[in-house]
From Swiss-Prot:
Record-linked SUPFAM superfamilies: Snake toxin-like (SSF57302)
Tissues/organs with expression: Expressed by the venom gland.
Protein name according to UniProt: Long neurotoxin OH-57
Entries under InterPro entries matching the protein: Snake_3FTx, Snake_toxin-like_sf, Snake_toxin_con_site, Toxin_cobra-type
Keyword Coiled coil: no
Coarse class of the protein's main subcellular location: secreted
Length: 91
């Protein structure tokens, strides 16, 4: 009887949705689970003094709200897992 009860408890815990967390790219090839409350992924890009030789600077991450757009900075926000890949790695 105890085994049956323990089995039911384990199955219940496994089947419960204990809260979903977003997974976003943190770099070109690494993804991480976002902290609670941060359900958006973003990709921020901008040019610095090396833009001509190295290309745009990129910042990947998670956010609760889409970061504020500033002059010279492009920001893309999305709300599905790993939706913020490196621009050259997009399908």
């Amino acid at each position: 009887m105890k085994t049956l009860l323990l089995t039911l408890v384990v199955v219940t815990i496994v089947c419960l949705d204990l809260g979903y967390t977003r997974i976003c790219h943190k770099s070109s090839f690494i993804s991480e689970t976002c902290p609670d409350g941060q359900n958006l992924c973003y990709l921020k890009s901008w040019c610095d003094i090396f833009c001509g030789s190295r290309g745009e600077r990129l910042e990947f991450g998670c956010a609760a709200t889409c970061p504020e757009v500033k002059p010279g900075v492009n920001i893309e926000c999305c709300s599905t897992d790993n939706c913020n890949p490196h621009p050259k790695l997009r399908p």
